[in-house]
Each structure stands twice: as C-alpha cells, then as structure tokens.
C-alpha cells in the first residue's frame, strides 16, 4: 500500500498506476498460485496440509509486521507511471507476504484461476483506494487496525485447517 501511495504522489496519474498494479499482481500471483498447486500435487497428504495450516498461522503473525519501503527503493521514473508501477509492484511482491499467502492458497485449493483472481482482487481492494486517496486514506483508517484484522483472518483460516485435518 505504501508503494501505491508513493507512486500516486510521484506521478499523479492514478489510472495507469492501477493498471500497473493489476498486471503485475496477475503475473506474480498466477505464478505463485501455480507453484502452490503443483507443490500440493507433489506433496499431498497429512503432513503437507499440516504445513499449509501452520503456514497460514505464520502468515497471520507476519501480517502484524508493517511493510517497509526505503527511500533507496524508489522505482525508476523514466518508464512512465504504468511501466514503473508494473515493474516495481512485480519485484516488490517477490517473496512478500501476499505472494507467500498466494502459494499457500494455491496449495490448499488447487485452483490457479480462482486463487489468482481472488488474491488479485484483494490486492486491488487494498491498493486502489491508496492510489486515489493516498494520504487522506492513511489519516482516516488505522493501518494497525487493518493489519490486526488481516492477521486474525489468516490465523483463523490456519486454525480451521488444523481442526479439519
């Protein structure tokens, strides 16, 4: 979300930024979802389901750690808002919490299209308001509250998976 705010403030062109986020997320999450589904096909069984459940709980706890965006990580501006956003979001998502969660969801549900669609919609739901509202949004909604809610959802899903093993 912080990257979306920075890009919106820098370029002041929300539509290409939103499309950059959309296409970067689709590409990144399709690969992650596919990787999760394939891993589940290779390692299906009780221990794998247990690992996925514990992974969701770990994701919930990891969600409580705020994202960082260093000034040194500023994206290159020479490409324009769409390409800069596309590249920056794709690279920032590699190994990030949402990518790890997408891998876990792909492993759990074995449906690359549904998982990619759902996680991409989630990313857009989090980032599009940030692009259009930026600083005003952060002043109105506590990021701490959002993190705690997301953490509770991840932990709840992990516990539900443990109970249904």
What are these language model-derived features?
Residues 1-4, 84-102:
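Functional transmembrane helices that embed catalytic/metal-coordinating motifs
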Residues 1-41, 100-122:
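Juxtamembrane transmembrane-helix termini in multi-pass membrane transport proteins
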Residues 13-72, 77, 129-140, 149-152:
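Membrane helix-loop-helix hairpins that form the core translocation module of multi-pass transporters
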Residues 26-27, 61, 90, 94, ...:
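Hydrophobic/aromatic residues within the transmembrane alpha-helices of Major Facilitator Superfamily
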Residues 47-55, 111-126:
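Structural signature of hydrophobic alpha-helical transmembrane segments
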Residues 64, 68-92, 113-117, 121:
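Small-residue-enriched transmembrane helix starts and helix-helix packing motifs
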Residues 158-165:
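Juxtamembrane boundary at the C-terminal end of a transmembrane helix
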């Amino acid at each position: 979300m912080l990257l979306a705010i920075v890009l919106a403030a820098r370029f002041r062109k929300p539509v290409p930024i939103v499309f950059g986020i959309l296409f970067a997320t689709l590409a990144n999450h399709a690969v992650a979802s596919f990787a999760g589904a394939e891993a589940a096909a290779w390692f299906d069984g009780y221990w794998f389901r247990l690992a996925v459940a514990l992974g969701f709980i770990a994701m919930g706890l990891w969600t409580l750690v705020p994202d960082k965006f260093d000034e040194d990580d500023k994206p290159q501006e020479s490409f324009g808002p769409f390409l800069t956003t596309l590249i920056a979001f794709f690279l920032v998502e590699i190994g990030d919490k949402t990518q790890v969660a997408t891998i876990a969801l792909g492993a759990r549900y074995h449906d690359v299209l549904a998982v990619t669609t759902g996680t991409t919609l989630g990313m857009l739901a989090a980032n599009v308001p940030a692009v259009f509202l930026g600083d005003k949004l952060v002043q109105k909604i506590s990021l701490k509250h959002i993190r705690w809610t997301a953490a509770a959802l991840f932990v709840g899903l992990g516990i539900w998976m443990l109970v249904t093993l």
